[in-house]
Amino acid sequence: MSTPTPKVGFVSLGCPKALVDSERILTQLRMEGYEVVPTYEDADVVVVNTCGFIDSAKAESLEVIGEAIAENGKVIVTGCMGVEEHAIRDVHPSVLAVTGPQQYEQVVTAVHEVVPPKTEHNPLVDLVPPQGVKLTPRHYAYLKISEGCNHSCSFCIIPSMRGKLVSRPVGDVLSEAERLVKAGVKELLVISQDTSAYGVDLKYKTDFWNGQPVKTRMKELCEALSSMGVWVRLHYVYPYPNVDDVIPLMAAGKLLPYLDIPFQHASPKVLKAMKRPAFEDKTLARIKQWREICPELTIRSTFIVGFPGETEEDFQYLLDWLTEAQLDRVGCFQYSPVEGAPANELGLEPVPDEVKQDRWERFMAHQQAISAARLQLKVGKEIEVLIDEVDEQGAVGRSWADAPEIDGNVFVDSDELKPGDKVRVRITDADEYDLWAELV
């Protein structure tokens, strides 16, 4: 009589990089014969992959851990908040194990201790697909090219959680991308803590892919990915000089004309306190140059308002910079002190909460007007759209200007499409964030 199949529940919180970590753990568990189940009550054990970037993320992680304990009782914690084991056990002393980010083997071992794999299990090739277990829809996938970060931004604790930059060999990255494309993926989203720095730690060493030499560097990686016939989107790009090298690839249609660059602020004084590159005037000139080379370029960014020491003058400088930059997609966060962040030791005057809220609201209104005007320019134009979902009201997709989850949507008036379809549409209407379209 065979033993029952061990069942694992999994909750993945935080950023796409954490999602990729979850996929890796789940792939290993599936290879060992575990079944992944969608409910707490059906699971023999629950793994919670946490986020610990800001206080609100930690609070969410603790809440989900508590929910899993209440509903199941057997909980293993991993991920970025796992580096603060005391903070987790102080609130939830009954968790079975706590591991940090990238500690895949420790997570799997902890699962083994709670519910061992089936001894008679013999992994078959068809049990786990070649691309591994994916938590995204079939038509797009995140491609993580490195771990860690060499920056020391004063508001951030990522290096203390995920360590210094460690780039994956370019041959491994490209082989994974090939497997994803063969499995039906039509959009690869390149992610890391710092995509522009890819290969710095390896001194851009030459690796091999399909028998051909390829340097472990962002430009060469992008050139190789562009040969796979799918959308390639770059995230978490720092505005180093080497970013200039990929703009011509975008202009030539080899990469999506999309850059996700976290500028964080524009005031030189605030950028210096943040320990960020403080060349906002040169950045504006570079944005102008990029758009001259690639007029279709979409730039997404994130900003922080209310950083300690930020004055009304600094904030107004940021608004004026946004007017000049005319960014397409923008997110904004109110500064939240993070335990262990160097910013706590700067001795700068904290910005009152009500002032942070006021600046956030003004920032969002300011950028909303910019976004609405830029999207209005697309009305009447034809673009390609990748369909994400279809319901009774029509299809919802994204253009090259829209990353999943964080950017806008294109609503297509058609009930004949399915997720993963790429279609050509004509834009008929726009608001502050989204577009409406009809099939061409």
Swiss-Prot record:
Gene Ontology CC, one term: cytosol
Domain named Radical SAM core: residues: 135-373
InterPro entries named in the record: Elp3/MiaA/NifB-like_rSAM, Methylthiotransferase, Methylthiotransferase_CS, Methylthiotransferase_N, Methylthiotransferase_N_sf, NA-bd_OB-fold, Ribosomal_uS12_MeSTrfase_RimO, rSAM
Pfam families listed in its UniProt record: Radical_SAM (PF04055), TRAM_2 (PF18693), UPF0004 (PF00919)
Catalytic class of the enzyme: transferase
Catalytic activity: L-aspartate(89)-[ribosomal protein uS12]-hydrogen + (sulfur carrier)-SH + AH2 + 2 S-adenosyl-L-methionine = 3-methylsulfanyl-L-aspartate(89)-[ribosomal protein uS12]-hydrogen + (sulfur carrier)-H + 5'-deoxyadenosine + L-methionine + A + S-adenosyl-L-homocysteine + 2 H(+)
Cofactor(s) the protein needs: [4Fe-4S] cluster
Protein name listed in UniProt: Ribosomal protein uS12 methylthiotransferase RimO
Annotated organism of origin: Pseudomonas aeruginosa (strain ATCC 15692 / DSM 22644 / CIP 104116 / JCM 14847 / LMG 12228 / 1C / PRS 101 / PAO1)
Gene assigned in the entry: rimO
